[in-house]
Amino acid sequence: MKIFKKIASQISFFTIIPSTKATLEEVASASFISPIIIGVITALIDYSVVFVTSKFLGNLAFLLLLPTVEIIRGFHHLDGLLDFGDALMAKDYNKKIKALHDVEVGAGGIGLLLVYVSIFLTVLLSIKTLSFYSLLIAEVESRALGILLLAIMPPIEISYMGKIFHKNLNNKWKILSIIVEVVLFGNPYILISFAILLLFFYFLGYSTLKGSSGDFIGAIITLSFPIFLLIAERSCYLFFTSLFSLI
């Protein structure tokens, strides 16, 4: 029963959906399976909202995906994006660390928010269809990217959450499990993009914070979601076209 409690706790921790309460240690110990669990649930909600509203709004319903995604997450990852944006713009290391705990949003946070919204809206306005499969890929891969970086990157000294998650995830079998999730929900285009983003954010985290933190991981999940969504929509057509052309 304890394992089911840990699995259910992923839902209440990563979304606003009420579920079993658990300690941070319990959540972290089972978080390696959260990309699939949370990814499937949130993709179903994302698609349901867009599908129902598209009956009245047509393709304009795609724009509702942005607020839907953030509401389901409880704006927690978005808060991390704002904090990391401020840290990114701070000049010295101590100011970068301080920015992660500053309740006020600075120019860096607003700037990174505009980048995120611009990317998301550009993606939504550029696609002609929005499939459940693409949403599932984006949800799973963006979360797997964040969780994998928590597992392989040492946390910064002041990040309590980062320390707990890293301690519970830095295990070869759990890391392998996350990689399996990435492969299962990816095609060649997605996997190449995942590897590029993994390297980019890994070096960005080290150059900016000298490690990982909850805010940094929240920023990664937030920024990578629309990127994976676009690649999924574009690559699904290319992948299956090339696959059937070989048969």
Curated annotation (Swiss-Prot):
This is Adenosylcobinamide-GDP ribazoletransferase. GO terms for biological process: cobalamin biosynthetic process. HAMAP family: CobS. PANTHER family: ADENOSYLCOBINAMIDE-GDP RIBAZOLETRANSFERASE. Joins adenosylcobinamide-GDP and alpha-ribazole to generate adenosylcobalamin (Ado-cobalamin). Also synthesizes adenosylcobalamin 5'-phosphate from adenosylcobinamide-GDP and alpha-ribazole 5'-phosphate. The lineage of its organism: Archaea, Thermoproteota, Thermoprotei, Sulfolobales, Sulfolobaceae. The gene is cobS. It comes from Sulfurisphaera tokodaii (strain DSM 16993 / JCM 10545 / NBRC 100140 / 7) (Sulfolobus tokodaii). The chain crosses the membrane at residues 32-52, 105-125, 145-165, 183-203, 212-232. GO terms for molecular function: adenosylcobinamide-GDP ribazoletransferase activity; cobalamin 5'-phosphate synthase activity. It is a multi-pass membrane protein. It comes from the Archaea. Pathway: Cofactor biosynthesis; adenosylcobalamin biosynthesis; adenosylcobalamin from cob(II)yrinate a,c-diamide: step 7/7. It is an enzyme of class 2 (transferase). One of its GO terms (cellular component) is plasma membrane. It is found in: Cell membrane.
